[in-house]
A protein has these predicted regions:
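Noncatalytic alpha-helical scaffold of FAD-dependent oxidoreductases
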Residues: 2-449
Length: 449
């Protein structure tokens, strides 16, 4: 979720030479590298940019410490390193197997690149994030998600992964053959190895129609929360926490036989919007996906923002907490008590639901969940004061923070929230006994106290 202006992508791809893997610190020091939002500056100037999996193996062997960079859409230090980072942007092959209904993608591929490709060949993935510009591998490694009470997060689409281990060897794990190890390896937080390829399940392409309603009383969620979130294939509620109301309800309806593209004029007292809207009042909706019940392919409706626009910047901060769905309304009321602390620093909050899964480090591990997502103004000193207040309110609900977003929850608490944490720690020790892929984020949140 974001408020920034979007610029149309040129589609140009700049290819680096082989030697760019070894760009010197002197060459990069003049331009400090940051994440996409600009709120985090990476602590190394050593960025390796291999073109092939074989070159990835060489980089891994040559480095004592290494972290994968991804698409830089994380808001914390999960991808950071004080020594070496590796960008797999040029590992961008896509292989569709129509017979097995799978697609294998290189670690540099984004959902915005993948979706049109498989759609043109008659296929789809079941879910997408609100922004299409994140990398497939990075999103799956952090359990990033779209929405839908019956839809698992993006990681649940994974059926196999290929990664380079600390000794430089290639390892494959699959859902079909590797059982628990696979369940522990999908949401790997970048600590298992350098993931080079990932295989996703696909399904026949489908159409979606989207409409928006305005001004839903928050009281309607007390007795109708499940009904509201099940009213579409994917449903998002937006609020600024003022006036006990949901400012907008975005309903994405999966089309099929007998499914209408006509939305009723009222929805639990909320009014059907008469024009296309941006989640933030007063902002142009030009960059949002089509609304008002206009049918379109899945990849042009499931994200909130259009794929052929790419964000020029992201001057914002993000936090997100996952609570059990059966306590969702109580969690909403608990956060609402802090509205006057939250709203001055907030762009918007989005509420969305996700199905339970069995991936060890997923925020939805073994519990149907609701995510409470905050898009903040870039005011970190103030936001940093508000987060512990929110986290205290959500503590009774065992809220799990998004791995790639901002949080102040203590490491010991985070570890307690994941029943399979000891098994995950053992898995990391098996594949990376010397901690080559560990960084401060992993040391703190997975091993800290």
């Amino acid at each position: 979720m974001d408020k920034r202006q979007f610029l149309k992508a040129s589609g140009a791809v700049v290819t680096d030479t082989l030697l760019s893997r070894y760009i010197s610190a002197e060459q990069q020091a003049a331009t400090p590298r940051t994440n996409w939002a600009g709120n985090y500056t990476f602590h190394t100037d050593h960025l390796h940019q291999p073109k092939t999996v074989e070159e990835v193996q060489q980089v891994v062997k040559s480095c004592a410490k290494l972290r994968a960079l991804g698409a830089r859409h994380s808001f914390n230090g999960i991808a950071d390193s004080t020594e070496n980072q590796i960008s797999l942007k040029q590992i961008n092959q896509v292989e569709l197997d129509a017979k097995s209904r799978t697609v294998t993608v290189g670690a540099g591929v984004t959902y915005g690149q993948l979706a049109p490709y498989i759609n043109s060949r008659g296929f789809a993935v079941h879910n997408l994030a609100s922004l299409p510009h994140v990398s497939v591998v990075g999103a799956c490694a952090t359990a990033t998600h779209g929405s839908g009470s019956k839809n698992g997060n993006l990681s649940t689409e994974v059926s196999a992964i290929e990664f380079v281990t600390a000794d430089g060897n290639i390892r494959h794990l699959s859902r079909a053959k590797d059982g628990d190890q696979f369940l522990g390896a999908v949401v790997n937080l970048g600590a298992l190895g350098i993931v080079t390829r990932i295989t996703l399940d696909v399904q026949p392409t489908f159409q979606v129609a989207q409409s928006v309603y305005e001004n839903l009383s928050m009281s309607q969620l007390e007795h109708h929360l499940d009904e509201i979130f099940l009213s579409g294939y994917s449903v998002s509620l937006f609020t600024d926490w003022q006036n006990h109301r949901i400012t907008q309800v975005w309903i994405k309806r999966r089309l099929g036989p007998g499914v209408s593209t006509t939305f009723p004029p009222e929805f639990f007292g909320a009014k059907l919007a008469t024009k296309k809207l941006h989640p933030l009042a007063g902002h142009s909706a030009e960059n949002c996906t089509e609304q008002q019940g206009i049918p379109g392919p899945w990849y042009e409706r499931l994200p909130h923002f259009r794929m052929n626009f790419t964000p020029s910047s992201g001057a914002e901060l993000q936090t997100e907490y996952f609570v059990p769905r059966d306590h969702a309304y109580q969690a909403i009321l608990a956060v609402e008590q802090l509205r006057d602390h939250i709203t001055p620093h907030l762009f918007i909050t989005e509420l969305r639901t996700i199905a339970a899964d069995n991936l060890w480090m997923s925020m939805a591990y073994q519990r149907p969940s609701m995510a409470i997502h905050f898009t903040w103004k870039p005011e970190w000193p103030e936001v940093k004061q508000v987060l512990p207040m929110i986290e205290e309110k959500l503590a009774p609900f065992s809220a799990r923070p998004h791995w790639a977003k901002l949080s102040t929850i203590p490491p010991a608490t985070i570890q307690h929230l994941y029943p399979k944490m000891p098994a995950y720690q053992a898995l990391l020790k098996q594949y990376d006994p010397q901690g080559k892929f560990r960084n401060d984020f992993i040391d703190t949140n997975i091993y800290g106290s």
